[in-house]
Each structure stands twice: as structure tokens, then as C-alpha cells.
Amino acid sequence: MSELEAMGISVQRGFVTNTADVDGVQTSESEATQLAFTLPKPIEIQATFSKEGFGNKLVKIFKKEIQAGDPAFDETVYVKTDTPELTAALLEKADVRAGIARLVGAGGVIEVDGPFVRMELAGHHETEDADTVTFVRALIG
């Protein structure tokens, strides 16, 4: 039993290979791990944590983004949320911010929609890593 399952969290894991091609010629290939969790109790947070990119910077001109006050986090992670107060409270913890930044910085995405959490992590992960466990533990308190 995994550490997350021991906390009462339902875990689904899948693996995908993403390829890019130009004019029918494969130019790159990368593997990703897709995780889906159902938390043991309902939470109200709705947020997506993704890589800060040019498009996100344009969106920030028109819509305020949560800033954690941690320059490394704020420059790496774009936070989209419908629950800004709850999301800001989650980001008060330095270890949670650091874990999110590492996962997203490596090419991952985290989506939280109430008791449902979806992560896509770069690479092949057969077990939960410390950053995933820290993040989910922070969600359930």
C-alpha cells in the first residue's frame, strides 16, 4: 500500500508517451506519468498550477494572479484559481511551494478541483515522490 493510499486517498496512475513531429518526422519523445487522486474528504480549493509562459504573462495583464511572495515560485509557476483565499493559504507553506515549483519546473501540471486532484509529471514514476505526498498532505490538512 502506498503512503497516499494509507491516508485514505484513491490513486490512479497511467503513463503516456508524448511525441512531436515536423512534417511527419518525429523530432522528440517524452514520457509522462498521469496521476489522479480522490481525496478522503471534500475540500473547496479549485486551482491549476502550470509553467509560467508568455501566454500566461499576457493573461496577467487583464487578470490578477496570486503571487506567493517567493520569487523562485512566482517566476516558475502560473496559478489559476477560482478560490484565491484558499489557494493563497495553501501556498503559505514553503515546502508546498517548493514541491509545486519542482514538479511544474520539470514540465508537470497540477489541477485541483475539490476532492479531485490530477497531476501530470515529467518522466516515469512508479511510486509517489516526496513532493507529491507533501502537496496532497497539505490539501487534506
Residue ranges and their predicted role:
Residues 2-141:
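Charged, low-complexity intrinsically disordered regions
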